[in-house]
Amino acid sequence: KELFIGSVRTPLEYWSPWRLEDKGDELLHIAGLQDVAGQITHLLTPSTLLDILQYFTIYATNSKKKKIKVVCRYQQYEGANAIVERVKEGKIKKGLIWHFQGSGKSLLMLFAAQKMRKQQDLGNPTVMIVVDRVDLDSQITATFNTAEVPNMVTTDNIKELHDLLEKDTRKIIITMIHKFKDTYPDMNKRENLIVMVDEAHRTQEGDLGQKMRSALPNAFLFGLTGTPINKADKNTFWAFGAEEDKSGYMSRYTFQDSIRDNATLPLHFEPRLPDYHIDRENLDIAFKEMANDLTEEDRNKLSQKAAKMAVFLKSPERVKTIVKDIVEHFQKHVEPEGFKAMIVTPDRYACVQYKEE
C-alpha cells in the first residue's frame, strides 16, 4: 500500500507517492507493507502541510493555456528543504543534490529559491541559478515565468550579470556559467548569496567554475545533477560535495527510485550482432603474442595505438553491418508505432559515417 498526493482535480495518473525515506525497514518497503499511517501523519502534521501550502505549491500554465495547481513530489520537498536548512544554519557552504534525470530538478530549484527568498532570518538573500546551455536557460526561465515567481531576472549578456552583482541585486537571478568569463575576484562578497548550479557535473572544474567561485567567495554553492563524475580531472563530489555529507551528497534520488515511483520509464537493453562485440580477453591474448618480440618502447607505442578502440568501432565493415541492422529493426519495430530513434556514435567522424551509410 502506498500514499499518493495531488492537487484537487488533478488526474490520478499525475499523482505522486509521498514517502519517508530512511525512516523505516527497507524489507517492509520491498514487501509493499510500508507504514502508510506514518506517512499520512507526517504529511498532515501542521508544520509539513503548511510548509507545502506556502512554499511547495505553485500555479502553472499547461499546454492548453489553462492554469493548473502543481504540488511538489516528496524528493523535491526533501531536497529543497535540505538546501534551505543548510543555508539557515550557515555552517556548511556547499552541497550536492544527486537526483536522476526527469525527477524535477527545475521545480526543486524553484521551490528552494522562493522559500529562501521569504525567510526573514536570511536577510533578503540573492539566489542565483546557473546553467551551462542556452536551452536549459530558456527552460528554467520558462518554468519560473509560468509559475509567476516574483523578483526574478535573467541576464542577456555579460554586462547585465556584472551590473546585477556589482549593484548587489537582491532577487532570483537566472544566468549562464559562460557569463562569468570576465568577472573579477571578490565581485560580491556577501554571505547570503546562494548559487544553485544545474547539471553540476559539467563546466565546474574548469576556468568558468573557478571564475564564479572567485567572484562570489562567500556564496553558498549547491550542485544538482543526475550523473555526477568522479575522475581526476572532473570531480563533481569535490566541486560540491561536503565532507560532512555521507558519500558526498546531501540528497539522492536514484534511477531505481524513479522507476519505482513511475517518474521514469524502465530502460531495456537488447544485445545485437554479437559477432561485432569486443572480446577483450582474446584481444589481450592476441596482443601479447604479437608483441613478444618487440622492445619495451615499441610495445608501449603499439599498446597506445591498439588502445584506440575507435579504430575498431569505425571500421567500414562494422559500420555497414550495424547500419543494416538498425534499418531493419527501425522499419520492423519503431516506424510502425510512429516513433523516432537515435543513433549514438563514438565521435563526429563516426556520426558522418553512419549518416552516409
Q: What positions do the PLM features span?
A:
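ATP-dependent helicase/translocase motor core
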Residues: 1-128, 135-150, 168-172, 190-192, ...
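Conserved helicase ATPase motor motifs in RecA-like P-loop NTPase domains
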Residues: 101, 201-202, 215-232
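Conserved helicase motor
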Residues: 131-134, 154-163, 177-182, 346-348
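Residues immediately C-terminal
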Residues: 136, 179, 199-203, 229-230, ...
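Conserved motor-coupling elements within RecA-like helicase/translocase cores
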Residues: 158-173, 186-187
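SF2 helicase catalytic motif II
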Residues: 188-220
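Interdomain helical connector at the RecA1-RecA2 junction of SF1/SF2 helicase-like NTPases
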Residues: 234-338, 355-356
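Conserved helicase motor "Helicase C" RecA-like lobe of SF1/SF2 P-loop NTPases
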Residues: 348-357
